[in-house]
Regions:
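N-terminal subdomain of lithium-sensitive/metallo-dependent phosphomonoesterases centered on the IMPase/IPPase/PAP
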Residues: 1-57, 215
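Acidic active-site catalytic centers that drive phospho-/nucleotidyl reactions
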Residues: 16, 55-58, 89, 148, ...
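Residue-level signal for inorganic ion chemistry
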Residues: 16, 60, 89, 98, ...
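General beta-strand structural signal in soluble alpha/beta enzymes
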Residues: 33-38, 54, 63, 140-143, ...
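Anionic group-transfer/hydrolysis microenvironments
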Residues: 39, 57, 91, 164, ...
Length: 225
C-alpha cells in the first residue's frame, strides 16, 4: 500500500489511484456509468443511464497517517435519484448500506437516527472549524464525511455540519451517506439551497445532517453567516 502523494494534484495519494482503478474494473464490467472523484465521468456501456458515484477512498489523509477512519463510498443513481448505497470502513470492515424505500443497515442492524431535537443537547460531527459557537453540547471531527454521516444515520452522532468555506465537498463524498441517512429517518440539506444530487464533477456542496427537522433548522441557522 502506497500512502505517498500521487504527484498529480494536492490531497491525492497513490492509494487513491490504485483503489480507483480496482473499482473501475468492476463497474465497467457491470456496464454502469461512473462518476469518480479520481477519474471523472464515464458513460456506461449498458446504456441504462444508471451511474455509480464513487469515492474510492474517502478520508485519504486519515489513511495516509494511520487513522483508522477511511472508507469506500458508492451510490447508484437512476432516473429517480439515489437508489442504493454502500459505505465500507476499509480499516474496520464495518459496512453501511441502504436501498431506496427499504431502509438503512449496518452489518445487519437496521439504522435509525437518535431523535435529538435540541441543539443544546446534541453531539455533532464537524468538517473544519465553525466560524462561531453553533450551540451544540459537544462536537467531534473525524475527517471522513462519508463515515461521519453514517454515524448520524446510526444515532451515534445527532448531527453533522460542514464548516468549510467556500464549499469543498464533491458529490462522491456524501451522496451514498445521504441516502443512508434518509433511509434511517435522518434529514439533510445543502447550506446554500443547492441540490445535493448532481453528476457535475466540478460542483461542490456544503452538507448538513440532523436526526430531526428541528435540530437541522437550528444547525442551519447557526451555520449561516
Amino acid at each position: 500500500r502506497d500512502f505517498g502523494p500521487s504527484g498529480l494534484r494536492d490531497g491525492q495519494y497513490a492509494l487513491d489511484l490504485v483503489a480507483d482503478e480496482a473499482a473501475l474494473g468492476v463497474l465497467r464490467r457491470a456496464g454502469v456509468g461512473v462518476l469518480s472523484e479520481e477519474s471523472g465521468f464515464e458513460v456506461g456501456a449498458a446504456g441504462t443511464g444508471e451511474v455509480v458515484v464513487i469515492d474510492p477512498i474517502d478520508g485519504s489523509t486519515n489513511a495516509a497517517r494511520g487513522v483508522p477512519w477511511f472508507a469506500t463510498a458508492q451510490c447508484l443513481v437512476d432516473a429517480h435519484g439515489p437508489a442504493a448505497a454502500l459505505v465500507v470502513n476499509q480499516a474496520s470492515g464495518v459496512r453501511y448500506w441502504a436501498v431506496r424505500g427499504e431502509g438503512a443497515w449496518c452489518d445487519g442492524v437496521r439504522l435509525q437516527g437518535s431523535g435529538c431535537r435540541e441543539v443544546g443537547e446534541s453531539i455533532v460531527g464537524l468538517n473544519g472549524l465553525p466560524p462561531r459557537p453553533l450551540g451544540y453540547r459537544q462536537s467531534r471531527v473525524f475527517g471522513a464525511v462519508a463515515l461521519d454521516l453514517c454515524l448520524v444515520a446510526a444515532g451515534v452522532l445527532d448531527g453533522y455540519v460542514d464548516c468549510v468555506d467556500p464549499p469543498a465537498h464533491g458529490v462522491w463524498d456524501y451522496l451514498a451517506s445521504v441516502l443512508i441517512c434518509h433511509e434511517a429517518g435522518v434529514v439533510t440539506t445543502e447550506l446554500h439551497g443547492d441540490d445535493l444530487v448532481t453528476l457535475d464533477h466540478t460542483s461542490r456542496r456544503t452538507v448538513l445532517a440532523a436526526a430531526t427537522p428541528e435540530l437541522l433548522e437550528s444547525l442551519v441557522a447557526a451555520r449561516r453567516p
